[in-house]
């Protein structure tokens, strides 16, 4: 894996708006194998949208990550943008 992405990290996924069907638009997410759609009355075909979510699974053998955004989306790790590394909470015992 080129950069280290771990469970709990906040990442961004980019999608391109496809065709419009009434108030919904289809989304094309690079390297995702499933179709997605959202309700967005202002999006036009060709627009690029950014979605942020947390990594819930990392498959190091196939270099893919699953992100909790639009449900769960599995994409190649090289197509996500790291927003924030996960930091464990620190507890102070008194």
Residue positions per predicted region:
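Short, structured interface segments
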Residues: 20-41
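Short, conserved beta-turn/loop elements at beta-strand boundaries and strand-helix junctions
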Residues: 18-25, 58-64
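Short strand-coil-strand connectors
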Residues: 14, 28-32, 68-70
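Intrinsically disordered, low-complexity, charged/polar segments
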Residues: 35-94
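Short coil-to-beta-strand transition motifs
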Residues: 6-14, 45-52
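Low-complexity, intrinsically disordered short peptide segments enriched in small/polar/basic residues
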Residues: 2-4, 10, 14, 72, ...
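OB-fold and OB-like single-stranded nucleic-acid-recognition modules
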Residues: 3, 16-18, 89-94
């Amino acid at each position: 894996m080129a950069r280290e992405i771990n469970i709990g990290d906040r990442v961004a996924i980019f999608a391109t708006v496809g065709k419009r069907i009434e108030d919904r638009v289809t989304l094309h997410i690079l390297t995702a194998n499933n179709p997605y759609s959202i309700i967005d009355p202002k999006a036009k075909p060709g627009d690029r949208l950014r979605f942020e979510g947390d990594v819930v699974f990392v498959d190091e053998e196939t270099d893919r990550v699953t992100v909790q955004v639009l449900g769960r989306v599995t994409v190649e790790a090289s197509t996500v943008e790291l927003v924030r590394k996960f930091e464990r909470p620190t507890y102070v015992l008194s």
